[in-house]
Regions:
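Short recognition helix of helix-turn-helix/winged-helix DNA-binding domains
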Residues: 1-65, 72, 94
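Winged-helix/helix-turn-helix nucleic-acid-interaction surface
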Residues: 65-128
């Protein structure tokens, strides 16, 4: 019974996967919700999605400014990369479009996080040694 329910869910694509190690990154709730939403709507073949701040804000229940702030922190952490898009109106003028989000390989972000933690630990150890002298 359970296997058939799983197979049915797979056909409906009513779910998405997040790596378990996402919890190692110590994302705050804003970063987590936004990252999870971007994973949910990404094109699984290209690892990209195009969505506006207001759309994300409505989906996760945060203010637009909060979404913009934490999208930047997700970029700094190496989880996503954003790219501006443009479109041409009917009268021929170029306008800014929504951001295109590139979901970056999770392993790289996790490795970067661990390297940062190791560097902080080494710095703290060096400070303790200097204090002891």
């Amino acid at each position: 019974m359970l296997a058939s329910q799983y197979a049915q869910s797979m056909k409906q694509k009513n779910f998405f996967l997040l790596p378990n190690s996402v919890f190692e990154l110590n994302l705050n709730k804003y970063e987590f919700y936004i990252y999870a939403y971007l994973i949910r709507i990404e094109d699984r073949r290209t690892y990209q999605c195009i969505v506006s701040y207001p759309t994300i804000a409505e989906a996760v229940g945060f203010a637009v400014n909060t979404v913009a702030k934490y999208v930047r922190t997700l970029e700094e952490r190496g989880l996503i990369r954003t790219e501006r898009t443009e479109f041409v109106t009917k009268d021929g003028r170029k306008r800014n479009g929504c951001l295109r989000y590139h979901i970056l390989p999770f392993r790289q972000a996790l490795d970067r996080h661990r390297e940062r933690q190791l560097a902080e630990l080494e710095l703290a150890t060096a400070r303790q040694r200097a204090k002891a002298k």
